[in-house]
């Protein structure tokens, strides 16, 4: 075994091509990313091309950090790019189906979790690991969806798409991290996937936002990748509108978390906060950087961000600095190259359906191949599992190269009225039972 730090003193890029690897250490409590040497790239990493694996390790995964999963998981630290074009490094967790024999290949799904926080406790590379202390992270529950993809016989890449600083809401760079995570998975000899592997994207809510950035960026940023389809579940099409919608509600912690993160990406926003936020507001934003998603929602329930300002909130939101941030973070600046399936609840209390209508129209007008499922009966949380069977079948068809003969731009037919939903949900219930009890998943496509 090569220790991660052994190459850190190298100058230039002479270590590229021989990334060190850590073998599996069982029952070891993981360190937080901020304290874990694995996350710190070696000297000269900026000379590597995006997607280069910098180091790797085998890890144990567990549901809610407690129930070990009998899966093969490898974490890859890789070189990627932030929104300003500067090099950075982040981690993806790659899981391969248990039944995949050496030399065999399979489709690769990049699954983007709803990290929705700055705290590294919520990063998938930490929260999915055995003995992780990540209470309040939404990421831990998403192991159920990841397992459903594994049961299809697909390999799954789960990137820390917010990057090493957890910059939730920042534009463009989540897509770069997703795409470079895919490159890293294909480049890794430890994972053993073919470079010609067909690739899919899937994410919901905050994960849908990251998936949308990847779908928009892949044509220009990663034309080398064979991305055959992207599923964008309730993808937060307009952060500015969502801020206004949720501020002062029971979910006010979500836009507050976004502001806490975006001030690190936009100097203009940081300057406005410094000039107009009171001491309590600045202290609160600092505390939010360490909170999990659930912690922040509980702490901020019903709070109005205007209470922490010296001027009316709407006046602050109308300043050029804030208008620039909200304009920059709005999806639709580019058109996805691969076909996309957009899933959105009409009666979503978190994401306004009109924002997603506008996004779907923008993509379609730009020439994208869009299937838009506009669900009449579901709401934000329930639609994710209810739409999973449809999502998995749609991705299966894309991996198989089937043409999109049924090009639906919009439908209000509820998922719950589709008989196939119940067959799929029954299958997902079996998968969930196996995950919760720590039993091995066998390949059994929907």
UniProtKB/Swiss-Prot annotation:
Was identified as a high-confidence drug target. InterPro entries: AB_hydrolase_fold, Lipase_secreted. GO terms for molecular function: triacylglycerol lipase activity. One of its GO terms (biological process) is lipid catabolic process. Induction: A possible member of the dormancy regulon. Induced in response to reduced oxygen tension (hypoxia). It is hoped that this regulon will give insight into the latent, or dormant phase of infection. Belongs to the AB hydrolase superfamily. Lipase family. It comes from the Bacteria. Transmembrane segments: none annotated. SUPFAM superfamilies: alpha/beta-Hydrolases (SSF53474). It comes from Mycobacterium tuberculosis (strain ATCC 25618 / H37Rv). Pfam families: LIP. This is Probable inactive lipase Rv1592c. The lineage of its organism: Bacteria, Bacillati, Actinomycetota, Actinomycetes, Mycobacteriales.
């Amino acid at each position: 075994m090569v220790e991660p730090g052994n190459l850190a003193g190298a100058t230039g890029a002479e270590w590229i091509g021989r990334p060190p690897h850590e073998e599996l250490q069982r029952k070891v409590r993981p360190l937080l990313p901020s304290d874990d040497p694995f996350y710190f790239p070696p000297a000269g990493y900026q000379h590597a091309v995006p997607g280069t694996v910098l180091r790797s390790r085998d890890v144990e995964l567990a549901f809610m950090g407690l129930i070990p999963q009998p899966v093969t998981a490898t974490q890859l630290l890789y070189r990627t790019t932030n929104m300003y074009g500067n090099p950075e490094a982040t981690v993806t967790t790659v899981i391969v189906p248990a039944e995949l024999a050496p030399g065999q290949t399979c489709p690769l799904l990049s699954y983007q979790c709803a990290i929705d926080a700055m705290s590294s406790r919520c990063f998938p590379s930490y929260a999915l690991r055995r003995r992780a202390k990540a209470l309040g992270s939404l990421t831990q529950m998403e192991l159920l969806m990841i397992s459903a993809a594994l049961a299809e016989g697909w390999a799954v890449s789960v990137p820390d798409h917010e990057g090493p600083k957890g910059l939730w809401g920042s534009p463009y760079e989540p897509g770069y991290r997703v795409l470079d995570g895919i490159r890293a998975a294909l480049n890794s000899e430890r994972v053993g996937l073919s470079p010609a592997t067909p690739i899919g994207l899937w994410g919901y809510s905050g994960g849908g936002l990251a998936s949308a950035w990847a779908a928009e960026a892949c044509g220009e940023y990663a034309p080398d990748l064979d991305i055959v389809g992207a599923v964008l579940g309730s993808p937060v099409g307009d952060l500015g509108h969502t801020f206004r919608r949720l501020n002062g509600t029971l979910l006010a912690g979500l836009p507050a978390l976004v502001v806490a993160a975006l001030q690190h990406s936009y100097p203009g926003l940081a300057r406005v906060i410094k000039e107009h936020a009171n001491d309590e507001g600045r202290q609160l934003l600092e505390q939010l950087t360490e909170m999990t998603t659930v912690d922040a929602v509980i702490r901020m329930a019903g709070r109005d961000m205007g209470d922490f300002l010296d001027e009316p909130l709407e006046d602050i939101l109308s300043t050029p600095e804030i208008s620039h941030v909200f304009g920059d973070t709005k999806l639709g600046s580019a058109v996805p190259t691969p076909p996309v399936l957009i899933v959105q609840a009409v009666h979503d209390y978190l994401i306004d359906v009109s924002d997603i209508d506008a996004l779907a129209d923008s993509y379609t007008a730009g020439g994208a191949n869009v299937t838009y499922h506009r669900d009449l009966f579901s709401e934000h949380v329930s639609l994710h599992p209810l739409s999973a069977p449809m999502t998995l079948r749609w991705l299966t068809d894309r991996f198989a190269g089937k043409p999109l003969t049924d090009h639906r731009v919009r439908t209000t037919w509820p998922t719950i009225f589709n008989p196939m939903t119940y067959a799929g949900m029954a299958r997902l219930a079996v998968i969930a039972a196996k995950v919760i009890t720590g039993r091995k998943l066998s390949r059994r496509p929907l």
